[in-house]
Amino acid sequence: MFVKSTTRHIRIYAAEVHNSELVESDNMLTLDVDPDNEFNWDEDALQKVYRKFDELVEAASGEELSDYNLRRIGSDLEHFVRNLLQNGEISYNLKSRVLNYSMGLPKVESPETEGAYNL
């Protein structure tokens, strides 16, 4: 079994993809963002996640390739995705097969509540 980190929206594997299969690797990480398509993504938001991933991997260079270290990166990326959602850079995909609002209920403004809950 290869080293991996799986969160709700981020999956990281110490593996490469060959013929649509994951093949264990000691020098390659594969990132799967939002595998259940819970969010609507544009290319800019995805690139932000990829850049953050690269930054976190670079910061961890020289450390052991372990489940623990990958989970730290995965957890940091999960929080990053939450920030993208809270900042309105991504949104829930209401046509997704998964509608559990795992990062909080969607914010819907109405004339009665507009601006009432700003912190």
UniProtKB/Swiss-Prot annotation:
Family annotation (InterPro entries):
NdhM (IPR018922)
Instruction: Provide the membrane topology annotation.
Output: Peripheral membrane protein
Instruction: Give the primary localization class.
Output: membrane
Q: If you read the UniProt record, what top EC class would you report for this enzyme, in one word? A: translocase
Q: Can you list the GO cellular component terms from the UniProt entry?
A: plasma membrane-derived thylakoid membrane
The record lists its disulfide bonds as: none
Q: What is its EC number?
A: 7.1.1.-
Catalysed reaction equations from the record: a plastoquinone + NADH + (n+1) H(+)(in) = a plastoquinol + NAD(+) + n H(+)(out); a plastoquinone + NADPH + (n+1) H(+)(in) = a plastoquinol + NADP(+) + n H(+)(out)
**GO MF assignments:** oxidoreductase activity, acting on NAD(P)H, quinone or similar compound as acceptor; quinone binding
Q: Which UniProt keywords apply?
A: Membrane, NAD, NADP, Plastoquinone, Quinone, Thylakoid, Translocase, Transport
Kindly list the places in or outside the cell where this protein is found, as annotated in its UniProt entry.
Answer: Cellular thylakoid membrane
- PANTHER family noted in UniProt: NAD(P)H-QUINONE OXIDOREDUCTASE SUBUNIT M, CHLOROPLASTIC
Family according to the record: Belongs to the complex I NdhM subunit family.
Role: NDH-1 shuttles electrons from an unknown electron donor, via FMN and iron-sulfur (Fe-S) centers, to quinones in the respiratory and/or the photosynthetic chain. The immediate electron acceptor for the enzyme in this species is believed to be plastoquinone. Couples the redox reaction to proton translocation, and thus conserves the redox energy in a proton gradient. Cyanobacterial NDH-1 also plays a role in inorganic carbon-concentration.
How the protein assembles, per its UniProt entry? Answer: NDH-1 can be composed of about 15 different subunits; different subcomplexes with different compositions have been identified which probably have different functions.
Protein name as annotated: NAD(P)H-quinone oxidoreductase subunit M
